[in-house]
């Protein structure tokens, strides 16, 4: 599929800070877009429906108004927002509605994508902390995780996720973009815009690396450390049945952590060492990074968490009758 003359003009090199950017999508597979739109539309529908159902079950069931499920609702809300932040551009390309995005819209989308990624990492860390207290210090669980403290934790997560990424995102607005305005994904990422800029991007590059280390890497280390302490506490329990029961309460969270971090590591490795891979492979990994956690988390918690599983079945049985 060839670009129109108007589109070529809009994505040509310029020093304007108000130009449009071309969203490439699955380059070279434009003829298959109508077919690709079917699975992607289904995935987005499952993301939105699954996370809304988790939120609905927790909201309407008084017995689930506990710290563990409050944190799960934060995770579901984060996943829901992640799906909403990319649905317009991803499906817009596949449906033939859009091919371009303005700089302001691109910056806003990258802000929400990266902010929500940091937020998901923070929520997963908080859920690990919740499991640590529940297993290692159960007698003080309710006194430590009070409702007021949970609200403060939630506000801290939001502030931590979106405040610290503001400086590099604001800088994107004032860069000159003198390379061809062609993005390598179906959505906007900070590193994609940096690649097109001809301004001094050292601050953004170093700052972004610092954020990855201080948030994503630090969270992963703290989650691992919390599970080392949890495992030590579980192994100290004499009864094998009790050990199994305690470990079962952590299975869902462990799966959610793997579902979040494996795509991030894969995307990082592809960007770092996958220069020989086709553009389609890069776009596919990018979409897995965006869509896999929001798709899988409702499934994981609906299957592995007994309270959610029971109420989901009850919800579907009510809808049938």
From Swiss-Prot:
CDD domains: 7tmA_OR51-like. One of its GO terms (molecular function) is G protein-coupled receptor activity. Disulfide bonds join 106-188. Its main location: membrane. SUPFAM superfamilies: Family A G protein-coupled receptor-like. The chain crosses the membrane at residues 35-55, 64-84, 109-129, 149-169, 206-226, 247-267, 283-303. The keyword Glycoprotein applies. Gene3D superfamilies: Rhodopsin 7-helix transmembrane proteins (1.20.1070.10). It comes from the Eukaryota. The keyword Transmembrane applies. Glycans are attached at residue 18. It is a multi-pass membrane protein. GO terms for cellular component: membrane; plasma membrane. Residues 56-63, 130-148, 227-246, 304-321 are cytoplasmic. InterPro entries: GPCR_Rhodpsn (IPR000276), GPCR_Rhodpsn_7TM (IPR017452), Olfact_rcpt (IPR000725), OR51/52/56-like (IPR050402). Keywords: Cell membrane, Disulfide bond, G-protein coupled receptor, Glycoprotein, Membrane, Olfaction, Receptor, Sensory transduction, Transducer, Transmembrane, Transmembrane helix. It is found in: Cell membrane. Pfam families: 7tm_4. Residues 1-34, 85-108, 170-205, 268-282 are extracellular. Odorant receptor. This is Olfactory receptor 51V1. The gene is OR51V1.
């Amino acid at each position: 599929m060839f670009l129109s003359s108007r589109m070529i003009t809009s994505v040509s090199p310029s020093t304007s800070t108000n130009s449009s950017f071309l969203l490439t999508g699955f380059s070279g597979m434009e003829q298959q877009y109508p077919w690709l739109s079917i699975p992607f539309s289904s995935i987005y529908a499952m993301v939105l429906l699954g996370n809304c159902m988790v939120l609905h079950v927790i909201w309407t069931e008084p017995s689930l108004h506990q710290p563990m499920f409050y944190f799960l609702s934060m995770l579901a809300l984060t996943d829901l927002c992640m799906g909403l932040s990319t649905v317009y551009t991803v499906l817009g390309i596949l449906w033939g509605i859009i091919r371009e995005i303005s700089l302001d819209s691109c910056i806003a989308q990258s802000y929400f994508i990266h902010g929500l990624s940091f937020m998901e990492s923070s929520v997963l860390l908080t859920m690990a902390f919740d499991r640590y207290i529940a297993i290692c210090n159960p007698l003080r669980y309710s006194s430590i995780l009070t409702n007021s403290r949970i609200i403060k934790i939630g506000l801290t997560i939001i502030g931590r996720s979106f405040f610290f990424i503001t400086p590099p995102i604001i800088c994107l607005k004032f860069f000159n973009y003198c390379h061809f305005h062609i993005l390598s994904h179906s959505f906007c990422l900070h590193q994609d815009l940096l690649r097109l800029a001809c301004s001094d991007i050292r601050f953004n590059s170093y700052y972004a690396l610092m954020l990855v280390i201080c948030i994503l890497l630090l969270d992963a280390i703290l989650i691992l450390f919390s599970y080392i302490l949890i495992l030590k506490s579980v192994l100290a329990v004499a009864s094998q049945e009790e050990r199994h029961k305690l470990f079962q309460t952590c299975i869902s969270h462990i799966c959610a952590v793997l579902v979040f971090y494996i795509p991030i590591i894969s995307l990082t490795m592809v960007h770092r060492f996958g220069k020989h891979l086709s553009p389609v492979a890069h776009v596919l990994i990018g979409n897995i990074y965006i869509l896999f956690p929001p798709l899988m988390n409702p499934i994981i918690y609906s299957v592995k968490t007994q309270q959610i599983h029971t109420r989901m079945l009850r919800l579907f049985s009510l809808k049938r009758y």
